[in-house]
Amino acid sequence: MILCLPSRPRSATTAASACFLFAISVASLRGQAPVFSEDFESGSLNQAVWKTTELGNATVTVQQTQVAHGKSALQIHYPQGEKSFAFVVASHLPDAVRNHFFGRAYLYISPTMPAGHDVLLNAGTPGYPISNFLEIGASGGKNVMVSYQQNAANIPRNETLARGILYPVGRWFCLEWEFQDHPDRVTTWIDGEPAGELKDFVVKPRAPRAPKADPKAKADATETAPMPAAALQTEVAGTDLVKGFSDFSFGFHAWGAGAKEDFDIYYDDIVIDTKRVGPAK
């Protein structure tokens, strides 16, 4: 049962968000549930939990045809030729996962991802893609690529990455990860095995400003107005770069070449917690 006890009048959205936070916090304290979980079994997106971010013709739906467990899963559909993005974003999670957390999701890639820089999930500041975040994506549409992306407005651009193993395609697989902001670090596992890791890095600016939100622009595209030389960032250690995870996003974004054919990314059984989650039981 979920209890909601507002101390003063509030909007329906604010009340729903507070109710959501209260429910997951109490469950966590009792040891009955992780900090956050979503299995999509309601058959639709809970608007008190998720907001949808879409640009172009990529779409987000909850469907019942391709599922890992239960009867429903999230589908990101990407049409041929598109360079757009579509994500579901949770932004009301407790402070317990603001600087360090573990995650797990079941993914299904069909039939494959487009070549280039692909984004699957990330956590960072609001306003994606003009934001700072840690990311799990793909390199060349095939290999795990983990990265720190410094894309917020009016600061030097940075992209620091590491490549890992090949993604499975045409089947469900269990993706686990650990995101940490002090120091900044990304660790991933696929079906329980190490898949890719980014750690012990330094920030080396690549461009004066962040990329434009236009998905047709390259990831390192720059604004026309240059930043003053004094504002350019010197090389710094990779720690406290994100400055806290406030938005947790799941979906797909193709920065590079457009898709050569229609494809779909499915998500199921998403969990975020303060300890490693492991496979669904």
Per-range role (PLM):
Residues 1-12:
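N-terminal secretory signal peptides that target proteins for export/translocation
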Residues 38, 262-278:
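Extracellular, beta-strand-rich glycan-interacting domains
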Residues 76-149, 273-275:
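Secretory/extracellular carbohydrate-interaction modules
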Residues 150-174:
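Short, aromatic/His-centered strand-loop micro-motif at the edge of beta-sheets
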Residues 15-27:
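Bacterial N-terminal signal peptides
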